[in-house]
């Protein structure tokens, strides 16, 4: 009996050992199979990428877990990726080709540092941002492009008399660039330039004149009338200087200067200026040319509120004026020679409620920046009532407007970053261009 039990116990032990051996073998086989499958997939993926890089010279982005984890890590540390990952499906598979023009059209002008920092510098920032685009938006193959960007800087010819940009050379410089691309490439001639994009970051856009009457008389040059113009000028009524396909863009304000201003402002600092304006305010608005600066609006502001302690009005220049904007509740943005003003961007970026005094102005990127929610509009004829209007707003919905101004996406949409970042001004330009793809030869040919 004992012997029989002993044999049965030995048999059970052998069975258990045999079962464990089988289980270990199966698990080992599974892990080895998984390893070789993964290794083979990685090898094939690596081979595929290598073939792609050898056969296709256009830059592409390949996501990896390491890249993803590094981006999360960078975000936690407060850093952002140095290159934007912009995929074409965000903009209806939009593709842009940037002409590589001789340096006399763009880079040579950068010898003057002001060229990259003044209020007209969006022409430079956009060029740099387009060149920085990673992913699939910028193409190095012009035959697969929807649009062609022609980078000509015309705002960097600063006057030795008053320091302001002189743009009398703009028409001839752009015309020379068009002659160049139309003779060396086939793309301009096939559409008469309708799929070509230019910048005109001046008072009256592609009319290229600082005085409105002269701008209207000259109009948009014939050689640009079929193209797309990215311009700071825009009005809601018919105007000769926007009788061309156009996208209204914000004036350029250096992101670095704004970051520096924000960094130097104490978090607990209260806004101790109620209404702020610093800039040109003529006591006698009719200048030597016989024209009235700002349609007398700034003169009327000075005459009505120059002695009002609620209004901090300054006529002299001050390098640290952004810190004054950051201390203010309301920031006046009256027209100058043209309706638009860099104060719009600075006010939004620094959390001061913009008070827009420019009848009929068309503002940039209205689908993203809900201007009625973050600003006030006062008619030019109502400047004399400005104090009462602002008192009423302060007593009713000021806190709502200020809360809307805190939305970071609003501020981001008005900034030109290099490289471009998701949601910024360059991103908004790409979004606007993606809605004009009916001009693309590549798209029309795909339906033939």
From Swiss-Prot:
UniProt key word Transmembrane: yes
Glycosylation sites: 157, 189, 287, 397, 438
Classification via PANTHER family: EXOSTOSIN HEPARAN SULFATE GLYCOSYLTRANSFERASE -RELATED, GLUCURONOXYLAN GLUCURONOSYLTRANSFERASE IRX7-RELATED
Main localization (coarse): Golgi
Gene Ontology terms, MF aspect: glucuronosyltransferase activity
Membrane topology reported for the UniProt record: Single-pass type II membrane protein
GO cellular component, one term: Golgi apparatus
Superkingdom as given in the UniProt entry: Eukaryota
InterPro entries with a match to the protein in the record: Exostosin, Exostosin_GT47
Job description of the protein: Involved in the synthesis of the hemicellulose glucuronoxylan, a major component of secondary cell walls. Probably involved in the synthesis of the glycosyl sequence at the glucuronoxylan reducing end.
GO BP: any one term: cell wall organization
Keyword flag Cell cycle: no
Similarity comment text for this entry: Belongs to the glycosyltransferase 47 family.
Enzyme Commission no: 2.4.1.-
Segments traversing the membrane: 17-37
Protein name: Probable glucuronoxylan glucuronosyltransferase IRX7
């Amino acid at each position: 009996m004992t012997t029989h039990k002993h044999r049965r116990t030995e048999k059970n032990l052998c069975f258990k050992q045999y079962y464990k051996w089988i289980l270990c073998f199966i698990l080992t086989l599974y892990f080895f199979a998984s390893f070789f499958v993964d290794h083979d997939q990685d090898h094939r993926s690596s081979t595929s990428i290598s073939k792609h890089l050898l056969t296709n010279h256009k830059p592409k982005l390949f996501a990896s877990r390491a890249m993803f984890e590094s981006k999360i890590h960078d975000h936690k540390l407060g850093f952002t990726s140095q290159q934007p990952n912009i995929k074409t499906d965000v903009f209806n598979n939009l593709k842009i080709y940037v002409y590589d023009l001789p340096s006399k059209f763009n880079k040579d002008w950068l010898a003057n540092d002001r060229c990259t920092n003044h209020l007209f510098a969006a022409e430079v920032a956009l060029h740099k941002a387009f060149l920085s685009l990673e992913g699939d938006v910028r193409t190095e193959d012009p035959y697969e492009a929807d649009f062609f960007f022609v980078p000509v800087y015309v705002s960097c010819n600063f006057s030795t008399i008053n320091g302001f940009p002189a743009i009398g050379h703009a028409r001839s410089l752009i015309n020379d660039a068009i002659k160049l691309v139309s003779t060396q490439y086939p793309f301009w001639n096939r559409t008469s330039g309708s799929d070509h994009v230019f910048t005109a970051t001046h008072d009256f856009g592609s009319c290229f004149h600082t005085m409105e009457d002269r701008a209207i008389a000259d109009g948009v040059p014939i050689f640009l009338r079929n193209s797309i113009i990215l311009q700071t000028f825009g009005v809601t009524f018919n105007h000769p200087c926007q009788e061309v396909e156009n996208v209204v863009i914000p004036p350029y304000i250096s992101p670095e200067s704004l970051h520096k201003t924000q960094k130097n402002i104490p978090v607990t600092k209260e806004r101790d200026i109620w209404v702020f304006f610093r800039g040109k305010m003529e006591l006698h608005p009719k200048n030597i040319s016989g024209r009235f600066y700002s349609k007398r609006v700034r003169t009327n502001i000075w005459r009505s509120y120059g002695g009002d302690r609620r209004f901090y009005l300054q006529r002299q220049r001050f390098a640290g004026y952004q810190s004054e904007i950051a201390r203010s509740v309301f920031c006046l943005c009256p027209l100058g020679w043209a309706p638009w003003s860099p104060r719009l961007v600075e006010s939004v970026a620094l959390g001061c409620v913009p008070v827009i005094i420019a009848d009929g102005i068309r503002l940039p990127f209205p689908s993203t920046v809900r201007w009625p929610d973050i600003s006030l509009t006062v008619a030019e004829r109502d400047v004399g009532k400005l104090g009462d209007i602002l008192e009423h707003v302060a007593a009713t919905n000021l806190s709502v407007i200020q809360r809307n101004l805190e939305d970071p996406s609003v501020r981001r949409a008005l900034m030109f970053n290099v490289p471009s970042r998701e949601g910024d001004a360059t991103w908004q330009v790409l979004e606007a261009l993606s809605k004009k793809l009916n001009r693309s030869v590549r798209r029309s040919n795909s339906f033939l």
